[in-house]
Amino acid sequence: MRDYLKEKTFVRFPGGECYEILGMIGEGGSGLIYSAGKVVRQGENYVKENSLRFALKECYPISRQFNFLRMQSGEIVPENESEAAANYLRCVASMQLNEGQMTSEIYDSEAIRLIPIQRIASSVEISFDKGQHFHYVNNAFTVMASMENKGESIASWYQKNGRYTMEMIFRVIQETLFAVREVHLAGYLHLDLQEGNIFVTGQPTDESLTCFLLDFGSARKRLADGLCAPVGDQPIFSSEGYRAPEIVGIMTGETPDFRLGPEADLYSIGYLLLYLLTGRRYSTRMLEDVRKSYDTSGGGRG
């Protein structure tokens, strides 16, 4: 389990722009996502600039190959010193910093159901005493546009009240499909869709419901044929259960040159529907066992 930054931690970007952590609101395979408010210096102290909330993403990956931890200073480092682990962390940070360009291209395509990135930094200053003392950490951070009117993650929304009708759940899935379609039409695959990085706002009982996507750390550009280039040795992040079989094949090395397409995102949405309908989480192995059982019983025959 990753150790997240606690509430009231200050994160200061190069140039002096400073944010106060208000709590963790989501997580993906490549990092943690916090709710934050902007603070400004007033005399010897920092004060809240306004009531707007932003999303801060911190590079803190989960990997099958390497383990990472947070030092007392707040910096994310490999658990065991190795050049390979350090290179992996640098690669993930670089991918996160490239999110700005990707989300900008998607947003410029008239996509409205995503939260674009406003600021990026390969290192920041952190304060654990409300801005009295800061120190540098080599943690990559990005600031996403204001979270005002963007609601809450599906994870939070779903846990608040278990009394959801089929119609409400299917409306959320429909809105998620609309959001993912915008990404696909803009020429990208998301590849890390899960309940923690899909935000829902409005009422699930009427037309006001809208879903927004964030965390494009795993996103890949689609080529002319609609597929992305082979991932190769680059990290690819996806969450357990939501991970399409073809992504599993890439991660295990069974099909390293497989080219991913839109169906990988659709698989993740299918798993989201399963989770919302049952309230249960299924591992990749559990889903594979169900599939094999279905095939063995003859359920797949027409």
Task: Report each predicted region and the residues it spans.
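Juxta-kinase regulatory segment immediately upstream of eukaryotic protein kinase catalytic domains
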Residues: 1-16, 20-23
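Catalytic-loop of the protein kinase fold
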Residues: 184-202
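Protein kinase glycine-rich loop
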Residues: 22-28, 33
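ATP-binding glycine-rich loop module of kinase domains
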Residues: 36-104
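Activation segment signature within eukaryotic-like protein kinase domains
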Residues: 172-173
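Activation segment/activation loop of eukaryotic-type protein kinase catalytic domains
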Residues: 196-241
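Conserved structural core of kinase catalytic domains
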Residues: 115-163
